[in-house]
Amino acid sequence: MAAKDVKFGNEARIKMLHGVNVLADAVKVTLGPKGRNVVLDKSFGPPSITKDGVSVAREIELEDKFENMGAQMVKEVASKANDAAGDGTTTATLLAQSIVNEGLKAVAAGMNPMDLKRGIDKAVIDAVDELKKLSVPCADSKAITQVGTISANADEKVGSLIAEAMEKVGNDGVITVEEGTGLQNELEVVKGMQFDRGYLSPYFINQPETGLVELENPYILMVDKKISNIRELLPILEAVAKSSKPLLIISEDLEGEALATLVVNSMRGIVKVAAVKAPGFGDRRKAMLQDISILTGGSVISEELAMDLEKSSLEDLGQAKRVVINKDTTTIIDGNGNKEAIKSRISQIRQEINEATSDYDKEKLNERLAKLSGGVAVLKVGAATEVEMKEKKARVEDALHATRAAVEEGVVPGGGVALVRVAEKISRINGQNEDQNVGIRVALRAMEAPLRQIVANSGEEPSVVTNNVKDGHGNYGYNAATDEYGDMISFGILDPTKVTRSALQYAASVAGLMITTECMVTDLPKDEKSSSELNSAPGNGMGGGMGGMM
């Protein structure tokens, strides 16, 4: 086992504090409308420029291992806030820095660290309750635009694009951010259910000028197995041919004789038909076939349910207003499914999302939810250079996360005002002893830090502005972008409640652990280890006896 370096008490805390401050100072310069950029060097390609707190935090590793431990713990605050709400990483880092700095001063003055932590925790619990009372729902498009604009660093075009996307696909719809090809941001909306499986044969194409398969009011056959024998399909094909409607076949695979016969029938115009593979793999494929069947009002022909493809009828088929297929994707528009059944399926998927443990599973379940509930919107980010593209894309993703958080839990006045008002409301609470009271005051002082930093980044005097804001009431605050005071809601400066709440809770959680740290242990640096091993080597005294040898 490698030798360890151990530091205790004040010596350990000073090292840890230095690491906290290095990381937090790098992150906090990005806060607010007049926050600055941070340039990050990359091992390959051009440097990236960002105003995203968590992107800056992730890049920082310190040489001194004890200092690095402090930095990594604050990095954890930013990451947790980012995972929970998708934004508020800079605010969380700043709150953690303030609590750690003030808390360690109190520890150095002889306060009990555990009581300090209890006081901080009590203040945060009360603050979260007050935040919820202060919160107002974010229901209309205007409020969504304002939240998106603030989070995208005062870029109104991004805010309005996100609001438009949410309007078109619903609050539960999937909105993805991609790199565009032009200079301007664009919004592309795919209505209906789209999955990434194209036609099995180009001979199914019935729109040669566009290279698409378009089926109007088709029947949809869903089969949970591979089809290679045409005999299984004959009863369905005959029934569909009599109805004069087109047919879409979605199956695990379609090959050999079955595929060849379908192609010939389609080209001769006997039955207008197209075939695609079912999306996904394994259990996910079964679930997605079930989604499609509910959306279209049909049944999945599955041998597991003792259903026979040869004995199936038109009643087993789903229907839709339109189906469009290209070489990569299939889009089903306006399925004929029962609305109540679709709602029930959506509720079931939501429940699965709540129970899912892995991010990958959650992402796939959210995609399924969106396909059932409205559609998919793609925000294509435009920029002149690759460096600008990366920076812009990160900002748009932040704005999207912030608007989702706002719709979920509502909004509070932005610009650091919400935490200042909350601190005023809970300023009279008391702990069980004086040390806990000091912990409460540490948390209250930290709640002013975001406002102070926004003001500092805009070049004004933080103490003066903070006192002016405290003299006001309700939504009254300071607009750093225009250097004026007034109603933050009227200014359109809003923060999602979830973002502010998550930032405060995670900052207090990690900072409380750091305040109560008494010992730090790390591996000895390699050069120190090798020299100590060399000095203690068994043959190390041999050189001294060499002088008399001739």
Curated annotation (Swiss-Prot):
Native species: Buchnera aphidicola subsp. Cinara cedri (strain Cc)
Broad class of the protein's primary localization: cytoplasm
An MF annotation (GO) of this entry: isomerase activity
SUPFAM superfamilies reported for this sequence: GroEL apical domain-like (SSF52029), GroEL equatorial domain-like (SSF48592), GroEL-intermediate domain like (SSF54849)
Subcellular location per the Swiss-Prot or TrEMBL entry: Cytoplasm
Physiological role: Together with its co-chaperonin GroES, plays an essential role in assisting protein folding. The GroEL-GroES system forms a nano-cage that allows encapsulation of the non-native substrate proteins and provides a physical environment optimized to promote and accelerate protein folding.
Recorded catalytic activity of this chain's protein: ATP + H2O + a folded polypeptide = ADP + phosphate + an unfolded polypeptide
Biased amino acid composition, Gly residues: 540-550
Any single GO CC term annotated in Swiss-Prot or TrEMBL for this entry: cytoplasm
InterPro entries found in the cross-reference section: Chaperonin_Cpn60_CS (IPR018370), Cpn60/GroEL (IPR001844), Cpn60/GroEL/TCP-1 (IPR002423), GroEL-like_apical_dom_sf (IPR027409), GROEL-like_equatorial_sf (IPR027413), TCP-1-like_intermed_sf (IPR027410)
Annotated GO biological process: protein refolding
Region (Disordered): 525-550
Protein name (record): Chaperonin GroEL
Positions with a binding annotation for ATP: 30-33, 51, 87-91, 415, 479-481, 495
Family: Belongs to the chaperonin (HSP60) family.
EC identifiers of the protein: 5.6.1.7
Keywords noted in UniProt: ATP-binding, Chaperone, Cytoplasm, Isomerase, Nucleotide-binding
Pfam families: Cpn60_TCP1
Residues forming coiled coils: none
Subunit structure: Forms a cylinder of 14 subunits composed of two heptameric rings stacked back-to-back. Interacts with the co-chaperonin GroES.
